[in-house]
């Protein structure tokens, strides 16, 4: 294919054209803050384009059973066994999607359900225009619970890394 696509449960979704400057600036700042924290730790941060292959939990992880391939804006993976030359096979521990008007519905619906079902422990939705970050965490029932919606002047604690927070003023600066 000439265009970038994501495959979600066997259904093809066109990805947005190359992200704009603001999206890239926010993504860069988030990756930078995570990378400083993750230095010399077992978890690694990756940003799009980076394939995350999510197998059907009822089937094997063989390529012919992969019906979902997504490229989250940012993902953190703490299990090195999930990493291969093609990306990540299995659920990352943490995912961030930076929404645009073209992707907001998919990120709030299809990807929300997909990441919840796949076992992504923490999911952030960043809204550049409103300067908000919505944080969901898996609860004991393996369902997402809304932790909070954070504004640009707040720090966002990273649930999977106790004691570490992202500074939103820096993320939304500029």
Task: List where the protein language model places each region.
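Gly/Pro/Ser/Thr-rich low-complexity, intrinsically disordered segments predominantly at protein N-termini
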Residues: 1-174
């Amino acid at each position: 294919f000439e265009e970038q696509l994501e495959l979600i449960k066997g259904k093809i979704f066109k990805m947005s054209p190359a992200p704009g400057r603001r999206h890239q600036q926010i993504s860069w700042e988030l990756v930078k803050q995570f990378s400083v924290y993750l230095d010399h730790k077992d978890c690694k941060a990756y940003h799009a384009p980076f394939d995350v292959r999510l197998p059907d939990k009822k089937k094997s992880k063989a390529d012919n059973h992969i019906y979902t391939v997504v490229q989250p804006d940012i993902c953190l993976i703490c299990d090195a066994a999930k990493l291969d030359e093609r990306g990540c096979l299995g659920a990352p521990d943490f995912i961030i999607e930076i929404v645009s008007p073209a992707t907001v519905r998919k990120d709030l619906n299809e990807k929300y359900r997909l990441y919840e079902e796949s076992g992504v422990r923490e999911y952030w939705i960043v809204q550049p225009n409103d300067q908000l970050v919505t944080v969901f965490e898996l609860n004991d029932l393996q369902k997402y619970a809304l932790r909070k919606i954070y504004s640009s002047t707040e720090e966002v604690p990273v649930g999977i890394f106790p004691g570490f927070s992202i500074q939103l003023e820096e993320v939304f600066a500029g």
